């Protein structure tokens, strides 16, 4: 079995690792960094940029730079979180067959496709590091991701050309990375505050077994929300003094977002920061600038309610775990947003001033844990068992719109459970089974995952037919539902895949599209490398002419200069193809080689002549020199 990579597909940043040599190793990207911004950009030239290159041009290309795509992964456009995301980003979120997607210059991309581009880059970086092709991967998701979001994440991996062996929860992966070397039995709490999601998980680690006791969280709460509070504040202050709403200008909004993120980071170590955005907009009076000081105290007052919400989730998780606060030995802080001092203070305070465990790298520990799980699946890591849980209850809609739970929140997975239901009317020929996920009492208030029908039920009075509904959750937390008419033996089953918004046919098409673009990208890369080679050749040849120009025959020099001019002219053409450039490069290369040969022969001749003269003079015993 080939190497298995572990991937933390984050809202703000992503990270990839591999288990080798008895440990999880973080794989640097080609830019030399351990994390890659989860940003994809589409340029006017048709290029697709991923990571740092995409982030660098975000301000000048806000409409076609996609960030925080994880926040709309697996969301229906009708959901409030999709609508909220639409108002916070610089790109256009649209409805595609009921699901949230993005519109880039008239072309619609699903969140799975955008995420696949990020995963593809991580895959390429891993292959460059490992030195061989990589296919198998373990990908992490927030513990509070629902079935639709999990399935969408797995689909993204498939589109990127990955065989996703396992989807595991981020806090569980973190605990795995922390506790692999642990020799003692202990209860740990993982507080995972990332860019767009928050999870808290309580685990018991005992003799290589990692058992999740409880989990809680919010898949739409994270550092992005901290940033947005600063953006709202900056915009309100500027609007108050200048009467201009900067959110109406996509470029200005992107500058606000970048400034907010930087200010948040600075306030983790400083008590005050200055936000200086010159030329943020233009009015009839001329260019306008935004200059504001922001104190940590002011920032903390903005985000206090958000951090308090995370504490409420800790309370829920602790209650469901059945443990007292004193039973928690370690509190592991995971996710870049845990660097915010207020979050650290409030978590420590909740546990009576307990010291937090900051021994793990909050940006890398999730990927490391995923890599360890990859090692477990590959057989490299022995005697480790993960016992995770389903984060939300699963059930079906029954008479009166009630959500009847079949698998309760916090049930250890994998799991399979069944219940018997019946018809609501006499001689009912079919039943529609609506699958829902959530904790609300009525189906309409929960997340709808899918709908399927069991037909040809034998005619009988209401309540007589026995219909067995079975829920089967695999180790990835992905659900399959089946129903069987006990009287006729007829059955129907579905994997809740439609909940991600993509059919198998659509996924296969996207895989092919990704392969197609890979070929295009490869061609584009070859063209860029050829242009770089051409520029270097021109520079070197011109340098040689400058240094040895008087030693080159006039005709040969003219040919070389003509070849340089022709190559420069073709490079000026932005539409020049490889086929146009290559012959010009070849011509100049051959000419420069001839020049080098002439120069070499000239030097050899000069040295030979000098040697002859020296010999002759030596023979005559004559010294030709001037002496002062």
Curated annotation (Swiss-Prot):
InterPro entries: ATPase_NBD, Chaperone_DnaK, Heat_shock_70_CS, HSP70_C_sf, HSP70_peptide-bd_sf, Hsp_70_fam. GO terms for molecular function: ATP binding; ATP-dependent protein folding chaperone; unfolded protein binding. Keywords: ATP-binding, Chaperone, Nucleotide-binding, Phosphoprotein, Stress response. The keyword Transmembrane helix does not apply. Induction: By stress conditions e.g. heat shock. The modification Phosphothreonine is found at residue 197. It comes from the Bacteria. PROSITE patterns: HSP70_1, HSP70_2. The keyword Chaperone applies. Residues 597-628 are annotated as: Disordered. It holds the Pfam family HSP70. Belongs to the heat shock protein 70 family. NCBIfam families: PRK00290.1, prok_dnaK. PANTHER family: HEAT SHOCK PROTEIN 70KDA (PTHR19375). Acts as a chaperone. HAMAP family: DnaK. This is Chaperone protein DnaK. It comes from Sulfurimonas denitrificans (strain ATCC 33889 / DSM 1251). The lineage of its organism: Bacteria, Pseudomonadati, Campylobacterota, Epsilonproteobacteria, Campylobacterales.
